[in-house]
């Protein structure tokens, strides 16, 4: 009789160990997948992320925003000419070189305005290159291999049936929690790209204010915003890399319970950090 009970207990323990290891495999596979997906998303330019959306944003910018920017540029350059004339002793000392200077500034301003999209895309091309170079290093250094979980299986096989059952329930519930946390990460990463499209659509207006000293701060702030959002992807990637390294360390500790709850804790920390980055950038720009 004891033989039968022992056999049933061993069979149940085997099922629970396999179930827990399956859940842990899912958790750590999710880490590898998340690092790869986020590296791909944050390293994609607006033109490559979604061609249809980018084409729509470009048409809106060129047909609706650019004419308004042209009117603003006309006002700015007229105001600039008046300032240049008044600065020379209220029109008593007018030199012809001033008009050549004004014509040159107007020509440069018009060229910048007509090439607004090329300038914006150049900013994101630079940030994409930096992110892609970093992504290769990060992914190669943080990938969690199946060998890391071998020590966890040994620890599980040495546990009794009761603790194994409790651990299996915990790992199952934590998988559901991880799904919700992944949705939060998805919203943050994709929300960044929507913010990029919104910034890109309004680009001609701040570009039109650059030539004048008094109104140029609007264009300068826009440039800072553009670079901040572009390189924000690198900060997101670094956060995910730190997360992956931390997960890798708890997976190698050989403590199943600590690995499960540590994974949840680090994932919550990742969501908080990504939210902090996403919120702090607009605050710093304002």
Describe the predicted segments one by one.
Residues 1-72:
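Binding/recognition "hotspot" determinant
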Residues 72-110, 202-216:
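Hydrophobic transmembrane alpha-helix segments characteristic of membrane transport
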Residues 105, 109, 220-240, 244, ...:
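Pore-lining and gate-forming transmembrane alpha-helices of multi-pass membrane transport proteins
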Residues 111, 115, 172, 176, ...:
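Hydrophobic alpha-helical segments of membrane proteins
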Residues 112-145:
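Functional transmembrane-helix hotspots
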Residues 132-174:
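Membrane-interface interhelical connector segments
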Residues 149-164, 244-264:
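Membrane-interfacial helix-loop-helix connectors in multipass membrane proteins
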Residues 275-286:
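Residue-level detector of conserved catalytic or cofactor/ligand-binding positions
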């Amino acid at each position: 009789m004891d033989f039968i009970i022992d056999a049933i207990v061993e069979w149940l323990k085997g099922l629970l160990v396999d179930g827990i290891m399956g859940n842990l495999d899912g958790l750590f596979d999710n880490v590898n997948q998340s690092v790869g997906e986020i590296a791909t998303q944050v390293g994609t330019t607006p033109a490559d992320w979604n061609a249809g959306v980018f084409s729509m944003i470009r048409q809106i910018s060129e047909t609706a925003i650019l004419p308004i920017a042209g009117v603003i540029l006309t006002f700015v350059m007229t105001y600039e000419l008046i300032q240049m004339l008044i600065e020379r002793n209220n029109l008593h000392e007018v030199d012809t070189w001033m008009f050549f200077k004004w014509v040159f500034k107007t020509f440069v301003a018009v060229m910048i305005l007509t090439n607004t999209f090329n300038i914006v895309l150049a900013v994101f091309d630079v940030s994409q290159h930096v992110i892609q170079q970093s992504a290769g290093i990060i992914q190669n250094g943080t990938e969690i291999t199946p060998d890391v979980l071998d020590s966890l299986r040994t620890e599980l096989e040495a546990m009794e049936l009761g603790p194994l059952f409790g651990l299996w329930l915990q790992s199952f519930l934590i998988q559901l929690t991880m799904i919700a946390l992944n949705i939060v990460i998805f919203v943050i990463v994709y929300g960044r790209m929507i913010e990029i499209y919104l910034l890109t659509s309004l680009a001609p207006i701040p570009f039109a204010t650059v030539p004048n000293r008094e109104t140029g701060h609007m264009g300068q702030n826009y440039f800072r915003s553009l670079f901040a959002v572009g390189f924000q992807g690198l900060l997101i990637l670094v956060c995910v890399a730190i997360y992956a390294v931390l997960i890798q360390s708890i997976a190698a500790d050989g403590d199943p319970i600590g690995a499960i709850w540590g994974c949840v804790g680090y994932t919550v920390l990742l969501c908080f950090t990504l939210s902090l980055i996403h919120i702090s950038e607009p605050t710093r720009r304002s």
